[in-house]
Amino acid sequence: SIMYPMITSVWEVKQIKKIVEEVKEELRAQNIEFGEVAQGIMIETPAAVMISRELAKEVDFFSIGTNDLTQYTLAIDRQNPKLDNIYDSHHPAILKMLKMIVDNGHKGGCWVGICGELGADTTLTETFLSMGYDELSVSPSMILKVRQEIRSLDLKA
């Protein structure tokens, strides 16, 4: 699969898809076989969140970059330690955006995954699963902890 970062418009996705089609035509002209490749986007800007319904019609999957999305939504420099106390990835606006993305993605037939620090935040694992996320992308050091959290949940309730 191919994932495109920092998307802010449907136009950008359409332009990228045109380039991919041009490359496919070049390969066909050279009789080079290739398989179909899923194309997706990183949702990491508030603009992409707000048009996620339209974007879902153009791609096969979404991966949410929660670190950048939080930074850009809250207008906070996460590299500035003086602002650590207001960098809140649990902010209600972030959680509402995450729900909007997964709902719009699924309505458009997209697989939706979450990555970044929030993917490994076990205080939100149940929330993400109940929202309908298809995948939580976590660092190798967090796999066991997240797996244990998932196994401890009663997801059928």
Predicted regions and their residues:
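Conserved alpha/beta-domain cores
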Residues: 1-157
